[in-house]
């Protein structure tokens, strides 16, 4: 949604009439349809997980003055107060899937809802998505992010609603510690490491005794009510060997990381799985 796409999302967010909002959504659907086609084509027959819009409001609206934008109107919250946003993204994804099928492709799609903290947020959003995918050309799996401490604590309420869940460990670490990553990385964490208060940055290596405990308890409670649920993590921890070892032993099915870290993530995951 940045670059050339930024004016479209701004038009939607600042629309003062349904007509203007609908015009913006039509533009959004057209743009995202092609974006999704470009993603699905090289990943043909492989699962592609699309996380619905999650960025904080200030990344789109420079005049937005939220006191704490990372905890403000973003993710599922933005979708719930502007209902048609996630519907539009879902329509674009279905359109892209149809185009791939017409080109003899085999799109395998998963849709993930971000920043859930309340069961009702997920229930409402999934209902909207299911209404949009009723005529989808193939099956679409639905999932949720677990990136707030409350979501981890009520994972057994969320797990029956979805096919998969993914821990967003960057945000989960921020909210568990009460750290603003952008603010404390240099000013606090480096000093804490020098003072031996911290051994490693919790944003570089997963905090097993705190954040990790939330992850482990959420996995256990989720599998108790939905044994077949697929569980993974996304974030910088997905490329850290120590974090990967902990996560594999905690029961995750996969880790997601930035491209340069994929080789080490694969190696460590395989080694740990064979033990």
Predicted regions and their residues:
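Conserved alpha/beta-domain cores
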Residues: 1-275
């Amino acid at each position: 949604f940045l670059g050339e796409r930024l004016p479209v999302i701004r038009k939607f967010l600042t629309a003062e009439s349904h007509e203007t909002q609908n015009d913006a959504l039509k533009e959004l659907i057209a743009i995202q349809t092609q974006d999704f086609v470009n993603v699905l084509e090289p990943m043909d027959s492989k699962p592609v997980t699309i996380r619905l819009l999650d960025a904080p409001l200030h990344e789109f609206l420079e005049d937005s003055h939220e006191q704490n934008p990372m905890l403000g109107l973003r993710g599922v919250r933005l979708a719930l107060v502007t209902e048609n946003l996630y519907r539009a993204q879902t329509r674009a994804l279905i359109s892209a899937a149809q185009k791939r099928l017409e080109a003899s492709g085999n799109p395998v799609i998963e849709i993930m809802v971000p920043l859930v903290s309340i069961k009702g947020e997920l229930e409402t959003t999934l209902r909207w998505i299911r209404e949009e995918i009723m005529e989808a050309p193939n099956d679409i799996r639905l999932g949720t992010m677990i990136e707030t401490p409350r979501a981890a604590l009520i994972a057994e309420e969320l797990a029956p609603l979805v096919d998969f869940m993914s821990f967003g460990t960057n945000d989960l670490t921020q909210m568990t510690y009460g750290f603003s990553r952008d603010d404390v990385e240099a000013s606090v964490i480096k000093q804490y490491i020098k003072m031996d208060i911290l051994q490693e940055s919790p944003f570089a290596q997963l905090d097993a005794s705190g954040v990790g405990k939330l992850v482990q308890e959420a996995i256990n409670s989720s599998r108790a009510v939905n044994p077949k649920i697929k569980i993974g993590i996304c974030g910088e921890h997905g490329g850290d060997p120590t974090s990967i070892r902990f996560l594999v032993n905690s029961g995750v099915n996969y880790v997601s990381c930035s491209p340069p870290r994929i080789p080490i993530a694969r190696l460590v995951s395989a080694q740990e799985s064979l033990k």
